[in-house]
Amino acid sequence: GLYGFFDHLLESHEKLIIDNCASGGRRIDFEMLRRSLLLWRSDLCWDPVAQQSATYGLSFWLPLHGVGSISLDPYHFRSGMGSNFTLALDYYDDPSIWNSAVQLLAEYTEVKDIFSGDFYPLTDYSTSQKSWIAWQFDRPDLGVGVIQAFRRQENNSNLRKFKLQGLQSDIQYEVFNFDTGLQLKACGY
């Protein structure tokens, strides 16, 4: 029924783009992906670990997917970043919330196009609160990449090294840390 309905809509409206709200992941299948874009992959937008897990798992297969955040906490916000992003805030009682929103949305805008690039996991998949989870998105066509590394709530390690993909030893790379504002240049290894 649903596939036929979408087929009818697409045949009747040549330029139509259908946004697939994935129904908690139940509508992420090849037939649905043929007919629609997965712009809302799950309603688990309040759980950073669920967001991270979805990004890790889907990015192997889908260049365009996302959800967003319901929080301006940087950890939570960044956990929902992807090739598509929606920010849902309750600003009714506190219009000053937009100051933080503008800052985080500027950060997202700077890296958003990279999320449709090549995906490289930098850790094993895990939902454990004691682990790190990290990945790299790379856009060789644009000469840019982004690394997201999340130290989960019960992890006591302040430092973790990751072997990045696609670096060349004779090229100097610019690295920027959104948390500290630190910018440095380093050669690949």
Give residue ranges: language-model regions.
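Active-site groove signature of glycoside hydrolases
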Residues: 1
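Active-site-proximal substrate-binding groove within the catalytic cores of carbohydrate-active enzymes
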Residues: 5-185
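Positively charged interface segments
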Residues: 187-189
